[in-house]
């Protein structure tokens, strides 16, 4: 449709989009704003931002990586290529004897093969 064509070509002032992190690490979300990232729907491109993410990916020092991610996030906040309007939220009522429910479940998928009940 016309909306999707305009969005795909970058011919928009405001468009709806969504982003999920596939893993628990800042780069899961931040990489989508790199200049050449295929998931960069915003058109945002800042070589300084890309450089900070590359430095973070290259370092083994966790504290240094965190600092680099903070700098990259600050650039996004200063330049605001996307406006977070809402966040997905999932709530579930779970029997207290249910075990095997994943704790870090980013996309909400539950593998029922891992579930079981236990009184302990």
Q: What feature does the model see in each segment?
A:
Residues 1-2:
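Short acidic loop-to-helix transition motifs that present clustered carboxylates
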Residues 5-120:
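Detector for C-terminal structural segments
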């Amino acid at each position: 449709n016309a909306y999707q064509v305009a969005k795909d070509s970058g011919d928009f002032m405001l468009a709806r989009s969504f982003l999920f992190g596939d893993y628990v690490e800042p780069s899961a979300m931040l990489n989508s704003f790199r200049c050449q990232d295929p998931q960069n729907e915003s058109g945002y491109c800042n070589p300084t931002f890309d450089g900070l993410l590359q430095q973070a990916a290259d370092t083994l020092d966790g504290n240094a990586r965190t600092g680099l991610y903070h700098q990259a996030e600050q650039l996004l906040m200063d330049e605001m290529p996307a406006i977070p309007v809402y966040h997905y939220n999932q709530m579930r009522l779970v029997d207290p004897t249910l075990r095997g429910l994943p704790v870090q479940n980013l996309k909400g998928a539950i593998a029922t093969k891992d579930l079981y009940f236990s009184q302990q």
